[in-house]
Amino acid sequence: MANYSTSEFKSGLKVMLDGDPCSIIENEFVKPGKGQAFSRVKLRNLRNGKVWERTFKSGDSLEGADVMDVSMQYIYSDGEFWHFMDQTSFEQKQADETAVRDAKQWLKEEDICEVTLYNGEPLSVSPPNFVELEIIETDPGLKGDTAGTGGKPATLSTGAVVRVPLFVQTGEIVKVDTRTGDYVGRIKQ
């Protein structure tokens, strides 16, 4: 892979650090009044999700990580692994708990997800930005019960719990933003 100099660091760049693939979250170039310029970089380890803050002198370089982001279809979960399929080659990959992390609460069969692969193995899974899921359990909204914030918890078909307006009932399908976990709207059938 290519080497990236500190002047090429930007948010989202994937590099190797201490033998692990990392993604740059933040990069701040600092030029003190006296001394050599440096870059203060915040990186996320793609294997375990830990965030590191490192300082690099101006002119230092890091090796680029051989990481690919691939759109794959979620097929099923067998309890231990989540299985994904490449829609062009029909090749299947299985991701473990550490790769799926919080995305598991939004995954619905046949959804298209962004899977980050390193050496052909899934490192992380990003669900679609919006998903449509059925409410399997929520309290009934009583007429005139609007004194509070106007929301109630609802359990979705995947097990996720989101706050929904009082008028939403069990059995309805709602649209949820997976990045924030917020209710967006209800889907008419």
UniProtKB/Swiss-Prot annotation:
Q: List the disulfide bonds.
A: none
What the entry lists under InterPro entries is as follows: Elong-fact-P_C, NA-bd_OB-fold, Rib_uL2_dom2, Transl_elong_fac_P/YeiP, Transl_elong_KOW-like, Transl_elong_P/YeiP_cen, Transl_elong_P/YeiP_CS, Transl_elongation_fac_P
Post-translational modification, as annotated: May be beta-lysylated on the epsilon-amino group of Lys-34 by the combined action of EpmA and EpmB, and then hydroxylated on the C5 position of the same residue by EpmC (if this protein is present). Lysylation is critical for the stimulatory effect of EF-P on peptide-bond formation. The lysylation moiety may extend toward the peptidyltransferase center and stabilize the terminal 3-CCA end of the tRNA. Hydroxylation of the C5 position on Lys-34 may allow additional potential stabilizing hydrogen-bond interactions with the P-tRNA.
Subcellular compartments: Cytoplasm
At what positions is N6-(3,6-diaminohexanoyl)-5-hydroxylysine found? Answer: K34
Q: Predominant location of this chain? A: cytoplasm
| Pathway(s) served | Protein biosynthesis; polypeptide chain elongation
Its GO CC terms are:
cytoplasm
Record GO terms (molecular function): translation elongation factor activity
Pfam families assigned to the protein according to its UniProt record, in alphabetical order: EFP (PF01132), EFP_N (PF08207), Elong-fact-P_C (PF09285)
Q: Which UniProt keywords apply?
A: Cytoplasm, Elongation factor, Hydroxylation, Protein biosynthesis
Entry's Gene Ontology BP terms: peptide biosynthetic process
Q: What does this protein do?
A: Involved in peptide bond synthesis. Alleviates ribosome stalling that occurs when 3 or more consecutive Pro residues or the sequence PPG is present in a protein, possibly by augmenting the peptidyl transferase activity of the ribosome. Modification of Lys-34 is required for alleviation.
- Family the UniProt entry places it in: Belongs to the elongation factor P family.
Protein name listed in UniProt: Elongation factor P
